[in-house]
Amino acid sequence: MSLMPFDDFYYPYQLRRRSPRWMDSTGSPWDSFATSRDWMTTPYSSTGIGRRDLSQDWMTTPYTPAGVGRRDLSQDWMTTPYTSKGIGSRNLSSWGSKSETIREMEKKFDELVRKVDRRFTGMLSMLDDPEPFARQNISVEHEGKTTSKTTKLQDFNMKVDVQDFKPEEVKVKVQGGQVLVHAKRENRDEGDGMFAYSCSEFKRAFILPEGVSAERLTSSLSRDGILQIDAPVAVAIDNKKTAVPVTVEHTK
């Protein structure tokens, strides 16, 4: 409720009127007879209505329950949670359970960030490394190499470490003379008001050697997460020399 200015008021229990003098000999804008019009625009003093020493900086100093005036700011009450019992410090033990929940959420989030960083770092290193299979966690063993010095072909055999994936998450297919290996895992975690999502994906493509039967290619996954891919030779090239008789004609 706002105060409306008026010329007369009782304080305390006596009729007082405004003095015709605005400034007295002491320089005070107030005398013993004052109206509400004046005290509404004049700083209030804890000792009564009248001029007060502004050196206390009470208008810029936090209020104390004991009265208006300077207080010890060392209590840091402005940065301390307010309590219904009064202004001042409070017991923060009630925040313990909530703080524990927040710390647990931060721990899960940090763990998720580390997993993503490891996956992302591995992908970047595979792009920079000309021979990634010899240095990455996902190892590949490839057999069935051919050389130009011999025409004898060997069966196609390949091993890939996919132990981070479940069997239903690994797919192998043949397309355009290549063996394509694709594995993908998605994790969703919901709890304590937090939602987390992570994705791990692995892709590899291998060229089938000439003469290998893609239709007879097989793949199997062992218990320790090793993917075995085999393809037999379809056509064997005979490198034996064949003698061609030469007929010599004699002309007379």
Swiss-Prot record:
Bridged cysteine pairs (disulfide): none
One GO location term (cellular component): nucleus
Entry-annotated residues carrying N-acetylserine: S2
Gene3D superfamilies tied to this protein: 2.60.40.790
Swiss-Prot/TrEMBL GO biological process terms: negative regulation of apoptotic process; protein refolding; response to heat
SUPFAM superfamilies: HSP20-like chaperones (SSF49764)
Occurrences of domain sHSP (ranges): 138-249
Sorted UniProt keywords: Acetylation, Membrane, Muscle protein, Repeat
Sequence repeats: 37-55, 56-74, 75-93
MF-aspect GO terms: unfolded protein binding
Keyword Phosphoprotein listed: no
InterPro entries membership: A-crystallin/Hsp20_dom, Alpha-crystallin/sHSP_animal, HSP20-like_chaperone
Chain residue ranges for the region called 3 X 19 AA approximate tandem repeats: 37-93
Similarity section: Belongs to the small heat shock protein (HSP20) family.
Subunit structure: Exists as an oligomer.
Protein name stated in the entry: Body wall muscle protein HR-29
Species for this entry: Halocynthia roretzi (Sea squirt)
